[in-house]
């Protein structure tokens, strides 16, 4: 769950709503329905993600149309996901309360630091308003890398 949430910058509600028919194993794609913008997007899945998702699907008991389920087989809830992330933060020894949206922010900052342009990042994260995306690029040191070419 952590890997998928981070790699795709998913909101808690988007993550727990993922269904197996959203995962295109043949083409290595994840179909994401963005909660706030309502716009669907298609993200590439890494080989690591595909392997983890295949294993999860194979081992999921009882079978469910939802990708992430509780131990009882019910769809994972956003509240359950928040509690899980908070517990992981405590177990990791973080001094702050860890919440799932931190994974979304980490995705945004990582992609901005890698030099992904603001419009592409906006589309990837599903932001309607570009101002929500600009926060990631404002702090990215790579934004100045091509200013001077010597």
Language model regions located:
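Conserved tyrosine-mediated DNA breakage-rejoining catalytic core shared by Y-recombinases
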Residues: 8, 17-55
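Catalytic tyrosine of NAD(P)H-dependent dehydrogenase/reductases that use a Tyr as the general acid/base
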Residues: 97-101, 136
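Alpha-helix N-cap/helix-start motif at helix boundaries, enriched for small hydrophobics
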Residues: 1-2, 9, 13-18, 121
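Active-site/catalytic core of tyrosine-dependent DNA strand-transfer enzymes
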Residues: 46-95
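Short coil/turn motifs that cap or connect alpha-helices
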Residues: 11, 19-21, 128-131
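Catalytic-site neighborhood detector that most strongly recognizes the C-terminal catalytic loop/helix
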Residues: 34, 125, 130-150
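C-terminal catalytic core of tyrosine-transesterase DNA break-rejoin enzymes
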Residues: 3, 7, 87, 104-128, ...
